[in-house]
């Protein structure tokens, strides 16, 4: 019997470790895949719906669905919400539905770290992260998997946010400073 699995952002974070994701991307990105241009549909109130399909022969089929509601900030809600649907590549059965915020942040950070692993000098010991948003901490955690950074500098337009992020990262054991 087949049952569709659901993974919350917390479950994605728990199960999707940075080192393993970097290695999965190293293997997966080396293989051809089909990733048509995303579809973007205009919704009322200047909102949008985006569809981003991807599939790889012999593997799965996925589609990320994203809504963008710019007015949500006034409601205390995130402007962007997303899910990722995974289907079996052999028979098309739905396998899983994942909240996509954590998935996207980790995939983006790990893709960046993978690129740095190929492009940065092996003896690189300093990392600069520009920005203090959601992605910044993920960038530090992922990049620290590919290099032994001795200095991690955080820069942001708001010095207080940069300092707070650096402090949080130091609590996690990273040599971060604003």
Identify the residue ranges that each predicted region occupies:
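Short internal alpha-helix immediately C-terminal to a glycine-rich phosphate-binding loop
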Residues: 107-127, 134-146
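Short acidic/polar capping segments at secondary-structure boundaries
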Residues: 102-103, 133-135, 142, 157-161
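NAD(P)-binding Rossmann-fold cofactor-contacting core
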Residues: 145-172
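Structural motif
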Residues: 129-130, 155
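Short acidic low-complexity segments
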Residues: 172-178
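N-terminal ligand-binding/catalytic initiation module
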Residues: 1-105, 113, 123
């Amino acid at each position: 019997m087949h049952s569709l699995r659901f993974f919350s952002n917390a479950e994605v974070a728990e199960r999707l470790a940075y080192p393993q994701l970097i290695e999965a991307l190293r293997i997966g990105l080396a293989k051809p895949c089909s990733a048509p241009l995303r579809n973007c549909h205009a919704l009322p109130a200047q909102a949008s719906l985006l569809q981003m399909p991807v599939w790889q022969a012999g593997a799965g089929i996925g589609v990320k669905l994203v809504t963008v509601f710019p007015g949500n900030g006034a409601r205390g809600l995130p402007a962007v919400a997303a899910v990722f649907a995974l289907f079996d590549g052999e028979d098309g059965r739905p396998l899983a539905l994942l909240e996509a915020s954590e998935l996207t942040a980790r995939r983006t950070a790990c893709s960046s770290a993978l690129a740095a692993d190929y492009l940065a000098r092996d003896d690189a010991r300093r990392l600069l992260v520009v920005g203090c948003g959601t992605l910044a901490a993920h960038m530090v955690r992922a990049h620290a998997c590919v290099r032994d950074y001795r200095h991690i500098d955080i820069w942001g337009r708001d010095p207080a946010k940069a300092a707070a992020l650096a402090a949080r990262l130091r609590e996690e054991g990273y040599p971060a400073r604003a």
